[in-house]
Amino acid sequence: MIISTWSRPRWTRRWPGSEYPPMSEPPRRRYDYVSDAAEIYRRSFATIRAEADLSALAADAQVVAVRMIHATGQVGLPAEMAFHPRLVTTARDALRAGAPIFTDAQMIASGITRRRLPAENAVHCLLHDERTPGLAYRWGTTRSAAAVSLWGSELEGAVVAIGNAPTALFHLLELIADGGPRPSAIIGIPVGFIGSAESKVALVENPWDLPYLVVHGRRGGSALCVAAVNALAQEAEI
């Protein structure tokens, strides 16, 4: 009979790098690469401007598109974008006036650069609110959609950024159709295979002429949504 003598190791928690003294010098340079942050940004945005076809977009929309391309590395993205003619001006005016930002994902809320926001705008994501799971269960929907119902009256005039759940975008449009508060602008870039493309079409065709930004099809996600919000929050491209 074989008797195992293995026991679970006892890991000692250490702060990262605590076993090594702080480095006084960087490691020896072995590769040829650009390390200056400002130069990386400058070259990146110049490359995007050179390679992407932005000709179909207005000048203010181009700034937003460049930021979104920078977040994804996909220079063909503008072909899939649709900007309402008033999206950029309306969203920026709302943010300057102190409008809150509502989003469907905590990753988006965390990614929004607070120092870019022009009026210390509040950023809300209620996905993890204690009321959300119960609402989702009773209504037979996703937690992302249920959380939208908790946005309440503050939604009036707000900027909405939906980057994960098509159900959240559909639910928002249904709330508005029932006479609920209307945001000033909607960034609708939910990602996915089920309902994503359809929810964006519904937003573009909204009967209230609400300003929108979408990336048609299945493409979307937190990185794209965050890039759009950060670009709208600050007019400078870099």
Region roles according to the model:
Residues 105-176, 184, 190-192, 200:
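Conserved mixed alpha/beta catalytic, RNA-binding, or beta-rich assembly cores of soluble enzyme
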Residues 14, 104, 187-188, 228:
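Buried hydrophobic positions in well-ordered alpha/beta secondary-structure cores of metabolic enzymes
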Residues 56-70:
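N-terminal glycine-rich anion-binding loops that anchor highly charged ligand groups
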Residues 23-59:
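Charged, compositionally biased N-terminal leader segments and the immediate start
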Residues 1-22:
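C-terminal catalytic histidine-bearing segment of alpha/beta-hydrolase fold enzymes
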Residues 194-238:
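C-terminal functional extensions of proteins
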Residues 79-94:
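A short, well-structured juxtamembrane/interface segment
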